């Protein structure tokens, strides 16, 4: 059966949209007051909930509680705050569409042009080792609903989901009190990514709770990743474009100082890094490795070369080598044919003698 596809809805096509009313509801209060003051300076009406409203009022800002705006109090211990037609209607209606404009006017709904929110700290709750019920209670419902409503209607509504976005938002407002479409579209993409990561974290955690045994593998595993770096190409030169992504919140163990590595280069780097790190930790000796096409052509330790090794490796005086240089010579000369054009890894800061042999 063919899927039913909803057609687009016609409305005003404007690049710059003035911010007249904003709804702020955040768990992370970083930068909140500064943003609130910037909005107030542009005569933006502020709507808010709970602790966010309290923080804004403490800074001397005038705020209307969402409950007062909707005429419906928060209920169920805060579980239901913003799930109301006056909130979602104000976010979702298409500006300039006659039917939508008539509907919101009849219902007494005011337009909401900016939504600033972040979600309950579910991941942090799990990381603390909280019990099942506490983790479930920290699954946000109203936040993701507003986030998706705002991001969907980004043609007219700006959605900010992180304090790191506030500076760019304030800069845009300071120009003319508006946000450009390019910013709204960019922030909407970030919002959908934020929502996807949030739901992926919950889904993976929940799947783990269903495991038959404590050490059993979960039946579902979802990951969210971000761009780490573009790559020269994939496995082979014709595989372009190519890029490396890393799980959100993680970092690479090293930096690329110059050049544009390909996919195999990065695999060599990651594997060689792990090998020399483990050798250094396990044996407490400088270590080196020579990698080619994700396989070690050789690995060496900083142990003084004997006479036969010096002859084989063409080393006149082994005492002239530092332990790290010795480790590199051992790794590189283990199979010099296979090491041709290799990726070299060393466990310590490269000294002059090691560099000479490299």
Features from the language model and the residues they span:
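Structural motif
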Residues: 20-23, 44-45, 64, 88-91, ...
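A short, charged helix-loop
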Residues: 114-137, 141-179
């Amino acid at each position: 059966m063919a899927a039913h596809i909803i057609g687009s809805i016609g409305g005003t096509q404007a690049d710059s949209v003035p911010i007249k009313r904003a709804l702020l509801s955040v768990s992370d209060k970083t930068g909140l007051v500064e943003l609130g003051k910037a909005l107030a300076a542009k005569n933006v009406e502020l709507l808010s909930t709970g602790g966010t409203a309290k923080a804004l009022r403490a800074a001397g800002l005038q705020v209307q509680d969402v409950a007062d705006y909707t005429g419906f109090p928060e209920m169920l211990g805060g579980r239901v705050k913003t799930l109301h037609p006056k909130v979602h209607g104000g976010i979702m209606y298409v500006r300039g569409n006659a039917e939508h404009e008539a509907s919101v006017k009849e219902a007494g709904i005011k337009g909401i042009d900016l939504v600033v929110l972040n979600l309950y700290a579910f991941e942090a709750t799990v990381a603390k080792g909280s019990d099942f019920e506490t983790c479930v209670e920290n699954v946000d419902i109203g936040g993701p609903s507003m986030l998706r409503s705002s991001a969907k209607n980004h043609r007219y509504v700006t959605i900010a989901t992180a304090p790191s976005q506030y500076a760019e938002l304030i800069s845009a407002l300071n120009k003319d009190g508006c946000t450009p479409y390019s910013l709204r579209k960019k922030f909407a993409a970030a919002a959908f990514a934020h929502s996807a990561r949030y739901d992926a974290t919950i889904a993976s955690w929940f799947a783990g709770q269903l495991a038959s045994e404590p050490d059993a593998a979960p039946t579902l595993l979802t990951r969210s990743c971000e761009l780490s770096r573009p790559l020269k190409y994939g496995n082979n030169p014709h595989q372009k474009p190519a890029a490396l992504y890393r799980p959100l919140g993680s970092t690479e163990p090293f930096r690329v100082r110059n050049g544009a590595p390909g996919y195999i280069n990065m695999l060599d780097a990651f594997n060689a890094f792990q090998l020399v790190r483990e050798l250094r930790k396990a044996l407490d000796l400088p270590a080196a490795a020579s990698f080619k096409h994700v396989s070690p052509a050789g690995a060496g330790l900083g142990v003084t070369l004997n006479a036969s090794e010096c002859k084989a490796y063409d080393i006149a005086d082994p005492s002239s080598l530092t332990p790290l240089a010795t480790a590199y010579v051992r790794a590189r000369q283990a199979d010099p044919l296979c090491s041709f054009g290799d990726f070299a890894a060393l466990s310590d800061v490269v000294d002059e003698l090691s560099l000479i042999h490299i």
